[in-house]
Design a protein with these regions (language model features):
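Conserved beta-strand -> loop -> alpha-helix junction used to position metal-binding or nucleic-acid-contacting
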Residues: 103-121, 128-130, 450-454
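Conserved catalytic core of nucleic-acid polymerases
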Residues: 154-157, 208-211, 317-332, 337, ...
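Conserved "right-hand" nucleotidyltransferase catalytic core of DNA-directed polymerases
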Residues: 1-59, 87, 104-107, 123, ...
């Protein structure tokens, strides 16, 4: 039913107080939770029966007052004994947070999206419509029917209340039913623990990280962009000079003519539109002529400029002055987190220009959490963040006070100079996981002695003392170490190292002869996956894989490579998620003013007042190194600095 009068609201709230568990689904005006206003609240606590509370709608609609509903719902949602079901709950928690409702972590019950991700990590979508068809075998009202799609999309505010109510109520009802089915399936398949104790408690940690965001120095990005423009122009002139005439570097057609017709370079591979000019081809051709190398550099720099230097400033939130990336919990089938808008996990750090982008990510005290809230809401500072706020705790938000709040906190002599970033990075985490799984004596001993693992492997395979290992030998050992994790073929290794296939094959054989435990682990993993149909991580996360052959040779096919990699990379992902929970818990317990901002695969980035850095270093290192007991010690490298590029070991 539609709850659109104060009397109906009072009656519903009275009933709602008695429900230990219900599903809430918010309809909003925006996909960005920090800009979204709530259009309506859909609530369901038993199948087939849902309520809709409209707070925004077309002119003339009968609506409830938004602030009144927020106040009424606050006491219910902030009650730690409640259990709340919701599809993609991370989004709704952020919207609620921006409206001053801080839902306790323990309140989160089942998010069908996250549950389905554990049951079927390779699925193309874990969206609500997909899940309704998959588990309940029915179709639901599509959001497209309500607001259209593409250019003609209208805002949820303009959907008639009856239509919005029908859509939202059905969503809440079906989400509740899905939650029960998915719970049963998770328990049946032995995945409930992984959901309840790892993925579920991670949600509020990600909410907090996304809400805090990270400060970006837009002026620094503009300066870097300007200097890249100059370099790109110079490069273009050099390229045209070598070719002997001007042409469009970004046109594959024109590039084909220059490389293969004019310079007569050999065609390495064909596509539908003629000879390929992709990265791999250019890298091969670069050995024969200087032009392809210049093209590679030009492509790299123009991608950096477009994707990061020019795009990042526009992603800075106007009200917080920070970038708020989204951490995706249900995208990577290995169990890793991914990040988007912007993707901070693939800033290329292999080149000086790519690495320099990190200089623009800086430490800063100011997070105007109040600035996130909509005008008219009154917001309460969360207990764990008391140190960041003024003495009085409740702020009615209007545009003017929002600005003064921001000012008052910046002017307290606690300038940005007094804050720093802290980066904590697991050292060789995947190779340590490999040592743990394979129980290979040589590998374990090297890690126990704390020697450089690539040097140790080079010494073993080349049969020389560690002191005598050359830089080139170490580089080869490093390529093999990582090649093993990803099941690289002699052909792939040869290409990576620029040696011939026979030499690469001999090197791989030498490696497996010395590290027989690793060879055995790979064999056993492939037999298990062949038998069960899935690879399993250290915490029991599964990834389904077909195509493991019964009679294999040394060079693995794609599914076999995926199988080995899923166990290693997936277990490393489990480990860092455990570490995030442990660090977050300790920061809250000790009311430490530091805060976790980013997770970049094996690295966590924090921000802290300089005075509190020593305690944060200890806390982070201790929790990360003890997140899980492996057969080899976990080592964490911690460094501190004003920005993400220039940090010094702590």
């Amino acid at each position: 039913g539609i709850v659109d009068t104060p009397e109906k609201l009072t009656a519903l709230i009275t009933q709602l107080r008695e429900q230990p568990r219900f599903c809430l689904d918010l309809e909003t005006t925006d996909l960005d939770p920090r800009s979204a206003q709530i259009v309506g609240w859909a609530i369901c606590w038993r199948a087939g029966d849902a309520w809709y509370l409209p707070t925004l709608g077309p002119t003339g609609s009968q609506l409830l007052d938004g602030a009144t509903v927020v106040e009424a719902m606050r006491s219910i949602l902030e009650n730690p004994s409640l259990r709340l079901v919701n599809q993609n709950i991370k989004y709704d928690l952020m919207v609620l947070d921006c409206h001053g409702i801080h839902v306790p972590a323990d309140v989160i019950d089942v998010d069908p999206m996250v549950g389905d991700y554990l049951l079927d990590p390779g699925a193309r979508s874990h969206g609500l419509e997909t899940l309704i068809e998959k588990y309940l075998h029915q179709t639901s009202i599509s959001i497209k029917e309500l607001i259209g799609s593409g250019k003609s999309t209208k805002n949820m505010v303009n959907v008639p209340v009856e239509k919005a109510a029908e859509y939202a109520s059905e969503d809440a009802d079906l989400t509740l039913q899905l939650a029960d089915m998915i719970t049963a399936k998770l328990k049946e398949q032995g995945l409930w623990d992984l959901y309840w104790n790892l993925e579920r408690p991670l949600i509020p940690v990600l909410v907090e990280m996304e809400q805090i965001g990270i400060r970006v120095d837009s002026d620094e990005l503009r300066r870097q962009s300007a200097s890249l423009s100059i370099r790109l122009n110079e490069l273009m002139k050099e390229i045209h000079g070598i070719a002997g005439h001007e042409f469009n570097i970004d046109s594959p057609k024109q590039l084909q003519v220059v490389l293969f017709e004019e310079l007569k370079l050999p065609v390495k591979k064909k596509t539908k539109t003629g000879a390929s000019t992709d990265q791999d081809v250019l890298e091969e051709l670069a050995a024969l002529h200087q032009l392809p190398a210049k093209i590679i550099e030009h492509r790299h720099l123009s991608k950096l400029k477009g994707t990061y230097l020019d795009a990042l400033p526009s992603l800075v939130h106007s009200r917080t002055g920070r970038i708020h990336t989204s951490f995706n919990q249900v995208v990577a089938s290995t169990g890793r987190l991914s990040s988007s808008d912007p993707n901070l996990q693939n800033i290329p750090i292999r080149t000086a220009e790519g690495e320099r982008i990190r200089r623009a990510f800086v430490a800063s005290r100011n997070i105007p959490v109040q600035a996130l809230a909509e005008s008219g809401a009154s917001t309460v500072a969360p207990k764990s963040k008391k140190s960041l706020f003024d003495e009085d705790d409740i702020h009615p938000v209007d545009a003017a006070s929002r600005l003064s709040l921001q000012m008052s906190r910046e002017d307290r002599g606690d300038s940005n100079e007094d804050w720093c970033l802290l980066c904590a990075d697991y050292s060789q985490i995947e190779l340590r996981v490999l040592a743990h799984y394979s129980q290979d004596r040589e590998l374990i001993t090297a890690f126990e002695q704390g020697v450089d693992i690539h040097t140790a492997v080079a010494a073993q395979v080349f049969g020389v003392d560690r002191e005598a290992v050359t830089g080139e030998q170490r580089r080869m050992a490093k390529a093999v170490n990582f090649g093993v994790i990803y099941g690289q073929s002699p052909f792939g290794l040869a290409a990576a190292l620029g040696i011939d296939k026979k030499e690469a094959g001999a090197f791989i054989d030498g490696y497996f002869a010395k590290y027989s435990g690793v060879a055995q682990f790979i064999e056993e993993t492939l037999s298990d996956v062949g038998r069960n149909g899935f690879a399993k991580t250290i915490l029991g996360r599964r990834r389904f894989i077909d195509g493991i052959r019964a009679n294999r040779n040394r060079s693995l096919n794609m599914p076999e490579r995926t199988a080995v990699n899923s166990v290693i990379q997936g277990s490393a992902a489990d480990l860092i998620k455990l570490a995030m929970l442990a660090v977050h818990r300790r920061i809250e317990q000790e009311q430490h003013p530091g805060r976790m901002l980013l997770q970049i695969h094996d690295e966590l980035v924090f921000e802290s007042p300089r005075s509190a850095v020593p305690t944060l270093v200890e806390l982070v290192r201790h929790e990360m190194q003890n997140a899980m007991k492996l057969s080899v010690p976990l080592v964490v490298d911690v460094s501190v600095g004003q920005n993400w590029l220039e940090t010094q070991p702590a």
